[in-house]
Amino acid sequence: VILGQGMPAYGALQRNIYNNEDVEHYDYDPEKAKAVLEEAGCELGDDGFYYRDGEKVGFVISVGAGDQVRVDIAQIAAQQLQQIGMDVTIEIPAQVDWGGQMAYLIGWGSPFDADDHTYKVFGTDKGANYSGYSNELVDQYLTEARQSDDPEVRKEAYDKFQVELANDPAYAFICYIDANYVADADIQGIDPDTIMGHHGVGIFWNVADWTIQ
């Protein structure tokens, strides 16, 4: 789907200076997924799908219509889950019902401070916490990180946050997508360190400082 322009994801701060690589990555492992289902009491039926208490195991992935890459990612995710025995399909609703959907494929990113894309996303009742995720330890660690300007204090808090998030995931992280831009060599001042994906401020964050030689 992304033609090699990206990397598998395992956490919220993977491309940030505060990334903690020593957490569970949840790498793609179909056999482990089957084992988890069976440990949870699911049994494989004659139709190739798992059942639990007489009900077929599955869910619907909702995805926005305006981003074909996300639609394609959702389709592949559904196909891979079907291959291990889960009845997973996708839908492309005209309007997003944050409270009524079963799962939603979403994306976000920020080249700025770690607080910018953690506190508001994973903090209880925060504005970008669309899934209603709530974890007291996550709240505590994110608050500690944003209340300090000491890099060591913040690193310790973000390390703990990432460990807890891996133990109690809010999302299934799929991938980080690279952004590719082409600009005339005469344009000076483009900052590659703040280039991000297809939405947000992105490459134009400092356009007022650009010059043409």
Briefly describe each language-model feature range.
Residues V1-I76, K160, T211-I212:
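Append "and occasionally in soluble cytosolic enzymes with long acidic Gly/Pro-rich linkers
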Residues I2-M7, Q14, Y18, E38-E43, ...:
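Sec-exported extracytoplasmic/periplasmic mature domains
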Residues G4-P8, I17-N19, A65-V69, Q95-V96, ...:
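Solvent-exposed loop/turn segments at secondary-structure junctions
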Residues Y18-A35, G45-V57, G99, Y119-Q147, ...:
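Short, solvent-exposed loop/beta-turn-alpha elements that line the ligand-binding surface or hinge
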Residues K56-G58, Q101, P169-Y171:
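Active-site lining segments that contact anionic ligands and/or coordinate catalytic metals
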Residues I61, Q79-A128, Y158:
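Periplasmic binding protein-like
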Residues S62-G66, P93, S148:
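Short strand-loop junctions, especially beta-strand C-caps/beta-turns
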Residues V71, N135, D139, P151-K155:
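Non-membrane alpha-helical structural segments and their capping/turn regions in soluble enzymes
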